[in-house]
Amino acid sequence: VEITDAHMHVGEFPLFDVRLDKNGLAGYLADNGIATGMIFNPDNALVRETVHEVDNAFGLYWANPKNPDCVSELRDYLADPKFRGVKMHPLLDGYHPDEPFVWPVIEVLIEHGLPALIHCGHPIFTLPWSIEELVTRYEEARIILGHMGHGNIVYIDGAIAVASRHPNVWLETSGMPMSSKILEAVRRIGNDRVMYGSDGPFHQPKVEQLKVQLAGLDPADLVEVMGGTAQRLFFGD
């Protein structure tokens, strides 16, 4: 199974006592059996430098729509083929995902046919139903619910329900602890809308991979969840 990791961070994170610098990324990907890694950091320049040094790493532009230069900077980054969408973290950056200043970011992504990976699973700004307001406004957008609700069963069920209501929503598995919910998600919305991510280096990729592998997926479903789905969404393959 060729693995595409849809959710990875690069940089120094002293609060968590973890780090993954550009010099260690290639080895980290190889050691964890990851063929393609989608990486991000609020320091987009660091990500750009990294993806141009590591062939099998690709960037997601960290979009903070409260930044007045966000949209123009996003266009600049998406002109670079090494950038394949955006990461948004409304909880960390402090905004509701359907604020009017978010809309221009989504409209740029629609122009490019690229997705937004949005952190999903914590109040007050990243509950699945809050993100659903944005999804409903832009049914042509491609929205990934990062962590598919994270660690709370109510939010996990909510994320699966939102995806079942909206064909433009994908689920990403990192940090969500229950293998059984990955199987449920595939059964409810299909293997073409569920994708593996690790949240490395905060989480161990091999542990996150095992969680998916133990979900009881059919071999064909496992191939899609571990890489095929993300490849199509980010690269059109």
Language-model regions, residue ranges each:
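Active-site environment of divalent metal-dependent phosphoester hydrolases
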Residues: G11-P14, N44-L46, K66-D69, D93, ...
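Hydrophobic faces of well-ordered beta-strands that scaffold small-molecule active sites
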Residues: I3-M8, T36-I39, F58-Y61, R84-M88, ...
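Catalytic pocket-lining loop regions of alpha/beta-barrel enzymes
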Residues: D98-Y196
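Conserved, mostly hydrophobic/aromatic
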Residues: H7, L29, Y77, V86, ...
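Active-site gating/metal-coordination segments in enzymes
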Residues: T36, N44-L117, R165, V169
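Mid-to-C-terminal alpha-helical segments outside catalytic/metal-binding sites
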Residues: V1-V10, L15-T36, N191-R193, K206-D237
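Residues at secondary-structure transition points
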Residues: L20, P68, H96-P100, F125, ...
